[in-house]
Amino acid sequence: MPHTPDLDAAVATLARGGVIAYPTEAVWGLGCDPRQEDAVLRLLEIKRRPVDKGVIVVASGLDVLQDWIDIAALGSEQLTAVLAQWPGPHTWILPVTAQAPRWVTGDHDGLAVRISAHPVVAALCKAWGAPLVSTSANLAGEPPARSRAALDPALLARIDGVLDGEVGGLAQPTPIRDARTGQILRD
């Protein structure tokens, strides 16, 4: 995705603590700046999702997460497995440092991270230059939207912006796997 005024507007919205909708690999997502507690709590309130569940973050690279993830806690084989699938449609639970905020990790001792190859997500992460929350654009318990037209109007009324684009070709949201144990948490 080329750098566009819509991308600039999305970044500006994130910078002021706003919540945006954007297409991901399989469904539309909601995003905000995970470093801003108020933004994350507002996003979770919009979705009716409890904070203890935690959220996925997407990023342009692990470098923007260095204060939150403890890569040294992974063995070389574990790290190789993670890096072999990025950028791509794979979410990994990574070990965290003490600086990882609870409003992002929830009641978990790991952080769900994806380095996406989806053109909109990748461009947004690059332009933003920081981690970004990525959670499905739906109310908790409802099916996620697979197109902009399917976004709940009540949800759209409560967010601050939409970055247009198409979802990728995945039939289901990205799989989630724990890098420490290899356990598949969502297939």
From Swiss-Prot:
Source organism superkingdom: Bacteria
Keyword RNA-binding attributed: no
Biological process terms in GO annotation: regulation of translational fidelity; tRNA threonylcarbamoyladenosine modification
Pfam families reported for this sequence: Sua5_yciO_yrdC
Catalytic reaction equation(s): L-threonine + hydrogencarbonate + ATP = L-threonylcarbamoyladenylate + diphosphate + H2O
Protein EC: 2.7.7.87
Annotated InterPro entries: DHBP_synth_RibB-like_a/b_dom, Sua5-like_dom, TC-AMP_synthase, TC-AMP_synthase_SUA5
GO CC terms: cytoplasm
The protein's name: Threonylcarbamoyl-AMP synthase
Species whose genome carries this gene: Xanthomonas campestris pv. campestris (strain ATCC 33913 / DSM 3586 / NCPPB 528 / LMG 568 / P 25)
Gene name tied to this protein: tsaC
